[in-house]
């Protein structure tokens, strides 16, 4: 018989062993029950929130998931922070009088009438509020600027207001939020505010604000009228959809081959 050829075994590569310092002991952590404390992470989704907060969170998520029609979606496009700050500075100059100021004015007026002095009473320039009042001013073409809150509940109260403003060619803007508008007029909340005129010293600043607002809202009305919102699914749902798409693409490629 012919001698068998020896099969050479491939020599194993020598790996350099890591030299560990004997002073440092390895102590792997066990994160099971009764073990080490787990690392900190965001646990907000496991918190049992109060019912009012739970409803707020669910409402916000639903608005992201469901398809939102353009009439409602336009209320997500609010005035930018810098422009809103300058707008509220102007609005605060024309705050209506509060109860204390009104009482003081009426007392002075009564004293003047008692003394027989003529009381000068000029109509003050103030911010108008109240949905019916603001609507009337828009219809009469007296409104120069309409400010609408983005978070009015129910939204049906003001959903038609941008269309009316555009029809009557009145500049309008949507701002955050109803409590901030309410603070201007000494109320808890306000759905909308309106300015009919301003003083001469504020006309230059007011005209600049109006130009910016027209460019952001009145001129873009047609664009916002066609833009739907929502339809954004969660991360788990998106991952499932991508996995399905990959499987379908793979099957299509196999068929082609």
Swiss-Prot record:
GO annotations of cellular component type: cytosol; cytosolic large ribosomal subunit; cytosolic ribosome; nucleolus; plant-type vacuole; plasmodesma
Alphabetized Pfam families for the sequence: Ribosomal_L7Ae
GO molecular function annotation: mRNA binding; structural constituent of ribosome
GO terms of biological process kind: ribosome biogenesis
PROSITE patterns: RIBOSOMAL_L7AE
Keyword annotations from UniProtKB, A to Z: Ribonucleoprotein, Ribosomal protein
Family to which this protein belongs: Belongs to the eukaryotic ribosomal protein eL8 family.
Entry protein name: Large ribosomal subunit protein eL8z
Underlying gene: RPL7AA
